Swiss-Prot record, chain B:
Species per Swiss-Prot/TrEMBL record: Streptomyces coelicolor (strain ATCC BAA-471 / A3(2) / M145)
Subunit note: NDH-1 is composed of 14 different subunits. Subunits NuoA, H, J, K, L, M, N constitute the membrane sector of the complex.
Any single GO CC term annotated in Swiss-Prot or TrEMBL for this entry: NADH dehydrogenase complex
GO BP terms, alphabetized: ATP synthesis coupled electron transport
Gene3D superfamilies named among the record's database cross-references: 1.10.287.3510
Catalytic reaction list: a quinone + NADH + 5 H(+)(in) = a quinol + NAD(+) + 4 H(+)(out)
Enzyme Commission designation: 7.1.1.-
Function, as annotated: NDH-1 shuttles electrons from NADH, via FMN and iron-sulfur (Fe-S) centers, to quinones in the respiratory chain. The immediate electron acceptor for the enzyme in this species is believed to be a menaquinone. Couples the redox reaction to proton translocation (for every two electrons transferred, four hydrogen ions are translocated across the cytoplasmic membrane), and thus conserves the redox energy in a proton gradient.
Membrane topology of this protein: Multi-pass membrane protein
Annotated keywords: Cell membrane, Membrane, NAD, Quinone, Translocase, Transmembrane, Transmembrane helix, Transport
Location(s) in or outside the cell: Cell membrane
Stated name of the protein: NADH-quinone oxidoreductase subunit K 2
Amino acid sequence: MENLIALLIAAPLLGAVVLLCGGRRLDAVGHWIGTALAATSFVIGIVLFADMLGKNAEHRAISQYLFSWIPVGSFQADVSFQLDQLSMTFVLLITGVGSLIHLYSVGYMEHDERRRRFFGYLNLFLAAMLLLVLADNYLLLYVGWEGVGLASYLLIGFWQHKPSAATAAKKAFLVNRVGDMGLSIAIMVMFTTFGTFAFGPVFDSVGKTGEGKLTAIGLLLLLAACGKSAQVPLQSWLGDAMEGPTPVSALIHAATMVTAGVYLIVRSGAIFNAAPDAQLVVTVVGAVTLLFGAIVGCAKDDIKKALAGSTMSQIGYMVLAAGLGPIGYVFAIMHLVTHGFFKAGLFLGAGSVMHGMNDEVDMRKYGGLRTYMPVTFVTFGLGYLAIIGFPGLSGFFSKDKIIEAAFAKGGTEGWILGGAALLGAAITAFYMTRVMIMTFFGEKRWQPDTEGHEPHPHESPRSMTIPMIVLAFGSVFAGGLFSIGDSFVHWLEPVTGHSEGNSPVSALTVTLATMVLLVVGAGIAYAQYGRRPVPVVAPRGSLLTRAARRDLLQDDFNHVVLVRGGEHLTRSLVYVDHTLVDGVVNGTAASMGGLSGRLRKLQNGYARSYAVSMFGGAAILIAATLLMRAV
Amino acid sequence: MNPVNYLYLAALLFTIGATGVLIRRNAIVVFMCIELMLNACNLAFVAFSRMHGNLDGQIIAFFTMVVAAAEVVVGLAIIVSLFRSRHSASVDDASLMKL
Amino acid sequence: MSAQLAAYSTSTGEAFQFWVLGTVAVVGALCTVFMKKAVHSALCLAGTMIVLAVFYLANGAYFLGIVQIVVYTGAIMMLFLFVVMLVGVTAADSLKETIKGQRWLALVCGLGFGILLIAGIGNASIKDFNGLAKANANGNVEGLAALIFTKYVFAFEITGALLITAAVGAMVLTHRERTERAKTQRELSEQRVREGKHVPPLPAPGVYARHNAVDIAGLLPDGTPSELTVSKTLRERGQIRDVSTEALSDLKALEQRAEERLERTNSGEGSK
């Protein structure tokens, strides 16, 4: 069974190689090759999963050693994989949702002449992501980490003919570099501290290490997670990343890649458990981001950007949960999986809407689409109910648990974090209801585009609706399935550990409070957008709205602090360079030049002149000799 | 008379020769001045030989003569070919070292 | 002369010889430097060298003294004269300095160098002269030979190699490979006819009653000298003598003299 692990990665990698190197002759069948290989990986995942279920909880983790990658003295990097319950969860999510989105892309990218390349990139992404979650050491994880960064860059900028897409890809890449720097430094610190970076030995030696070092490693890992998972302060790239094709947004920027940060924190749980300060920072980052993303999501009129804000916010929940330690690890992953289902479904629904609306993304130009695309409406609606935490659906179980866990943290922190999570739930209800109403309810507001084509909303082809339906099933039932008898907790407990914590408020109270806030949030949204007609042109809005439209000024902040600061620093350095360094250099050169110009006159080309200097030199030598003798 | 006077004479002749090298432009005369300097050295060597009571100084002077002969042969050949190509025996005319 | 005396001083005869011949040598050296014509310089240098040869002999270097006369004065100086003739015997150098400050620098350096050198010798305070009586006991030439072929044999061999190299070098430098066959008289005359100039033989140099030399250009009908009449070598050296105005100035001088004489006779007649 162990030998199958490498095949998980090999299948999509083969697809990427074949599709990217195969050339035009594969144009006709490339998308099916890509989809088939993704599905192959999924089937292998299922087989491994079945095998794993058949074992005892203690013996479920298996590993595969492939080859020694960099054997240099004490620096031993192996290519070896580890498949435990945590990795298994991710494998199934990645390959499952990945296969569905491959299928969806077949329809969505039908008219794109570079579809083969698109599927090649998707397969490359799958391979890198699987490498990330299957690696049994941090260095190999880093390879996968960079691999998904590369795939993300390529896919965001897939429509590179659009300057906005190219810029967005660049931005995502650059912001991610900051986080990657954190991961690479964390690996270096680990190597100097522990002498290794394999998961097992590192976690085993955590107990023997000072807390300061662990906190440093934890914070560096958090920086990496912030970059990849779009958490404050490295969140600015995710909104722009929506320039990529919608399946990319669904797969990479909603369901899988952006959750890699959560995976990293949960995987490194042993380190974080021993570094409470780092954990606190993680929870703060999570809480801030969940509110930040939610507020941004409220103000965006671009459906994908609203969903991106929501993604940011939901990952904020997961990071918050992951920062809570053993109380929250399981729920972070559980929310990650359910979020993978419903957010992917929501994005696919958004893609379906755009597909029917001539790629219009402004929700103010939608309205009343429920009759035109019923399947999309139903699946999107189920996703909507799941994300706001409607009782019985996935989001209800997973998000409720996180809020409970936040309260269970105890003390003032628990109250603050729990309060933030509750508030986030209310805002989530508001912005998702807003998206729902503006898109599917109310009167038609669509307009002819610049070329005069009136959009003809229509239901998407089968290849697109089937994945949406499957994901809608996931959104509805996953949470309940995981929660029956705490099956998910028991499943992950051997890897991440679990503790109940002692919540100052009962689970029922939390649930009721959540319900109340949910109704309030949805009600406000209905009052604002359902009762009144939605203006086609966005009103000016309050200061907060305007700020939120500009992503709460994150780009402005980056511009002023980083870009301007960098510019000023550069300018002052250039000034110093021009005046001081160049002054010294040029001054030396000029004085040398002047001196040479004078000395040059001695070099008149007459042999007799040179002879005089020789003769004079000889005279001086005699004088020196005589002087030395005299002394 | 002290035989050291031979050394003073050699020094004087050497200096005259060197000054001649510096102020004359005709390559042949310059060359003759060099010969004068070599002869002054020879005189000094011979005087040294007498001073020390062995013949090594004379041997060195002998070798100097041989080398001087070789030098004259090559030097005059150079002057002749210079004269052939430049129609002048002035050392200043060969100031091609200057740009 | 006893050996004891030789150690500290020399005979009166040698002292006399030194002061007389030394003066001659210094004068010869100065003349070598300051004579305008290279030939004179060479002759003065030869004189100095002969004086030096005498000094060698006086210092007990009999072999070197003879070699100095035979090789240096006889062979090398003659080589110099030969080259001087080849390059142009009459080409007098102008002693005017062309490089600014060169003469002053040379004089300062020369003076400084000479004073320092002489001061150095004086400073060395050499007292005892061993004399060569013992070293020359078996004869000077034999003593030299014994040293050359034992102690200095490698230097001697290398000097031989140097001489051969120098001889070959001189030949390489002065030898000019003839790349084409020399033209015969017939071909030359045919070429002249083809080119249409100087069809007759080249004109002869000027022949005058008072001058008859190859370096005087013949005059053209208008009285200007024709360079064609002088040999190419002399032309290149710039050694053509222009006597075209001499005839007129001579005539003028003749007339003047005749007038003076006539006047004198006239005045003589008048006084009568």
